[in-house]
Amino acid sequence: MNNSVYILEDRAIIYVNGEDAKDFLQNLISNDINKVTNNSSCFTSLLTPQGKFLFEFIVAKHKSGFFIDCEKTQSDQIFKQLNLYKIRSKVEILNLSNEFVVASFGYEKYLSIENSKDILGFTFKYREDPIILDPRNKNLGARLIINLEKLYLSLKKLDLKDDK
């Protein structure tokens, strides 16, 4: 089994939080935000009001809000687009790319971790950070969205080796 982990430096994390976060995202994304729970994440798109494709990303539940795992090159545009739609919604939108990273590891390693399940998009917490089986295809492996300060200790405890 390959225990390698890769820090996906081309990914960024945006956090949407607040009283209206769920309804706010439900009105903007192409997938049903109600599918996103502590145990399930989804792959979705952000569309224009006319239904034209803008961006795609993974949404995962985190605490009282939602992580958006997106391409780093598009994160500023996604952040601006979300803020454009914010209007009077009671939401806070934060770009956490300097604080959180996305670490990726293989499907076999994912299955060896306690509490994992062989279900696309299945999500469980390692401490308080989500581990997600890629919702698009299990062969893409799993992702751990984690605070940079906890990264190396968590990799050690999960028996993952950083292959930069």
PLM regions: where:
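Basic, glycine/lysine-rich polyanion-binding surfaces/domains
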Residues: M1-K164
